[in-house]
Amino acid sequence: MRGAFYVAIALLGSHTAAECNQDEPQGAPNNDFLTFGGTIEKMLPRRVLRERRDSKDKLTVHAGAEERVMDPPPEAVEQAIMKTAGVMRTDSDDVIARAAGAIRAHEEIEALFRRIDPTLYNVNGQALHALPKPTNYMVSVASDIPTVPAKRAKVKASADVINNAAWRVSKHDLRLAPPEPSPSSIASSGIRFDNQPIAEKAFKLDLNKHSDEVEIINSNSKRKRIDLTPSHVGEQAPHPLPELQKYKVSVAVSIPMVLATKLEGDGPTLIMRNAANIITTHDFRPAPFGSSTRTVASSNSQIHSQPIAQEASKFALNVDPNEVKSLFHENLPLVGHALHTRVGNDELVPLATVNSIKAGNTQGPYVHKPRMATDEEIHAAFLEAFNLPFHQYLYETSIMIKIVKRQYKTSPGNHRIVESFSSLVNNQELSKLKESLGPDLQNLLAGMLELQDDLKSLREAYYVKLLIMYELFYDFCYVRLDLFDALVPKVDRTVWILKLKNYETLPSHD
């Protein structure tokens, strides 16, 4: 509207200027220009209003024989007309150009086609794209439609077919129709789709011939993700796989300094720095679809393949870890009810000796305690819970279990732990240390061959490995209290290397 207003004013000014520049103005009875006051008589020509019979003009005019003239306007109107005429005379071309440019820009903005991202809405429980708004897609129709096809067809005049087509296109509403019914209703028998030959042939297909290849989807049902579980191992159902995102292990920043403080050294050594680099870059989450507890404990698994693990099955865990030296030379029986014989379902009848003759105890059946997990089961559960940074063998786990089951000073930050591992490490010879470290030897020594035969370096590497692994095993034991009979209250340490989070999310033991 503003552009049209500018154009109207420009045209009026141009017309006024053109009349002012005429060499021979219109004739008048008295003068060539109006005679009312001011300089306006020099700028504007005289206007003669001739009376007509059907004149409905209500303006006040002077009576005359053959013509009537208007009363002079007020002085304010004269000044306004003078200013407008002066501006229009000098800048009329610029005003017209600017007004025309504004009109064209406005028309171009309205004619822009914009892409509208479709929204989603639910149809029968399924998310479908919403149909666009009818006003979003604008189609321009040319005014000379009949001539365009005629020129392309090289015809002199437009034929009736072309004219009819042009008429239909110009009258047609090219906006989108309202949303159609859902796809399920399109296949009904009462609409146009079924009348097409292709649709009729499609419904004649015998789906029973390929029933396995036809997918039937219930529109009211929602697809659910099914968590896969591994197949049975040895005709026994394995433990459910843990959720990877729930196992969070915090790693300390100053690991070399913590190790140096525990070992009472002068400062971090190369082995301590290598160990810190290993665990800071390690992913402690278990691999997907890992081996189950029973498969880990099988004869082909890692825990029985090492010679040190085979010797661990002979150790009596009642022996204090400080006396671990004797464990290498003694062949003690396993802890258990070796003197009891099972009678009936759950009755255990101990045997008594009377005059060197064994006789059954007549004081009643022996009610045994609830069965607790063995070292092998605890070790297998520990391997299954985490992707450990170092190799953990059954012998090492057995020693750690004995430390945790003690009734005092079991926290990894206690000096008692250092003494317990000292007796174990100092008793190891060079060949045994190489077997105990296994593949971890290359990582802890960073490939330095000159240190592989150094007994002091190997003992330090094994010591560092045990201290790190016990930190993670200590938290694991207090998460899996179902694997232990009773433990002392857990100590929340301030100086640590590894710390486990999300205690409540670890899987339970069968």
UniProtKB/Swiss-Prot annotation:
Keywords: Host nucleus, Secreted, Signal, Virulence. A motif (RxLR-dEER) lies at residues 47-68. It is found in: Secreted; Host nucleus. One of its GO terms (cellular component) is extracellular region. It comes from the Eukaryota. Its main location: secreted. Residues 1-18 form the signal peptide. The keyword Transmembrane helix does not apply. Secreted effector that acts as an elicitor that induces cell death in host plant cells. Belongs to the RxLR effector family. The RxLR-dEER motif acts to carry the protein into the host cell cytoplasm through binding to cell surface phosphatidylinositol-3-phosphate. This is Secreted RxLR effector protein 24. The gene is RXLR24.
